[in-house]
From Swiss-Prot:
It comes from Glycine max (Soybean). PANTHER family: INGRESSION PROTEIN FIC1 (PTHR32246), PROTEIN SRC2 (PTHR32246:SF100). It comes from the Eukaryota. Residues 1-114 form the C2 domain. The lineage of its organism: Eukaryota, Viridiplantae, Streptophyta, Embryophyta, Tracheophyta. Pfam families: C2 (PF00168). PROSITE patterns: C2 (PS50004). InterPro entries: C2_dom, C2_domain_sf, C2_SRC2/BAP. Induction: By cold stress. The chain crosses the membrane at residues 246-268. One of its GO terms (biological process) is defense response. It is a single-pass type II membrane protein. One of its GO terms (cellular component) is protein storage vacuole membrane. Residues 1-245 are cytoplasmic. This is Protein SRC2.
Amino acid sequence: MTMEYRTLELNIISAKDIKNVNLFSKMDVYAAVSLSGDPLHPQGATTHVHKDAGSNPTWNYPVKFSVNESLAKENRLSLEIKLISDRTLGDTVIGTVHVPLRELLDNPGDDSSFRQVSYQVMKQSRKSKGSLNFSYKFGEHVPAPAAKTPKAAKAGQEPVMAYPPAGAGSSSMPYGTPHPPPPQQYAATGYGYPPQQVHGGYPPQAAYGYPPQTGYGYPQQSGYGYPQQSGYGYPPQAQKPKKNKFGMGLGAGLLGGALGGMLIGDMVSDAAEYDAGYDAGFDDAGGFDF
């Protein structure tokens, strides 16, 4: 079923007592007329600029639209007229007039003549200031105008907009996967040579200074023994290396003295046993008769 369209002829006549948005000069005013509610056939027009019009501009500017009659009867179409001050540093909206198209359709007037009406101009503050005068007339039915396709171009751009998020997601995956291996490599080296614990205590100096046999012998046992306990138990003691060296030297001296005493005692006891055995043998020999 085809939609029925009718022509709507307008004559934007004039405005009266509208707000003056200029401070030092008279306003140069024009009107922007648009028909809203029909997304397939957006329509609009702009009058000429009335120079030095002030608050009472006059245009007598003709405008012609094609109106979807079914949408107008459903009260889905409206006529919007904006009064604008033309300024060098940027135009300023003085006020706006909204007219439901059904209201005009229900009061067509004579078919052969225009009907003149007046509507209040609403400022941006929702207060009325001044009035707008225009006339209108509905014509005969006409074929539907060609549908404009601005949205088709936007639809074609939607896939382009979808690519950046996908690329961002794919690029984030490679950066996330390579990060776990480095901690595993450092952990593997940590099991072979505990660098953090070695720097806390001083066992690595013995391991690096002496041959591998001594390094894997006593120095490692002392490194995994006392240095770990001092590192985890009393971290502040690592800042006092001189006291630790003195304690180790004193312990080594005591241990060396004890070992020396034990060795000397063993030598004395061995000499005593040897002397006793010699005497016993001599006594036995003395029992022989020559």
